[in-house]
Amino acid sequence: MMLTIDIDTARRFILGKQGLWPGRRWRGMEGTEQAMRAMEYLQLDPLQIIARSHDIALHSRVLDYTPGMWEDVTYRQRTFFDWGGWLAARPMDELPHWRVVMRRERESNSRMRSIARDHADTIAEMRAILRERGTVSNRDFAMATRTRTQSYRGRKDSALALYYLWLTGKVMTHHRERFERVYALTETVAPAHLIR
């Protein structure tokens, strides 16, 4: 038997599922986490014209939301992690499922295999530096000391190596500075039971 609903009910259901109806119902830091969980996938926007789109999306759902609250629940509380070509914050407890996709990027993505082959020494160097320092940003490496690349992902071999390690799940975003990723080895960011 097919269930029939009217358009208003369907609209309210869809808006309610995304946290947009009936109005902003969450509040503060806890509400930010609840809204992000309801959205399931918060696309992060590096561009800021008036405000970053992820802050606008959360402001429309969370009372008392201020820009950057998503960073607290993502990077300080480690409730979410960011990842992917369409950069998004995802619930940390979903990491085991995403690690399958990360492994697929490493094994099946021809661009990633090409980066791994062409920049193997730099990738190994970045992993060693991360083991030594704990965290690292691409800005930590001056252009004068790096090999220039022709990739839209970065002008330096260090940028390409860090991007490769991040997309294939070997490193994660530890935190951000002026929206730029500061990387750390995955085992120092994610709870151990999620990366076995």
Where are these regions (language model features)?
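Long, low-complexity intrinsically disordered regions
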Residues: M1-R196
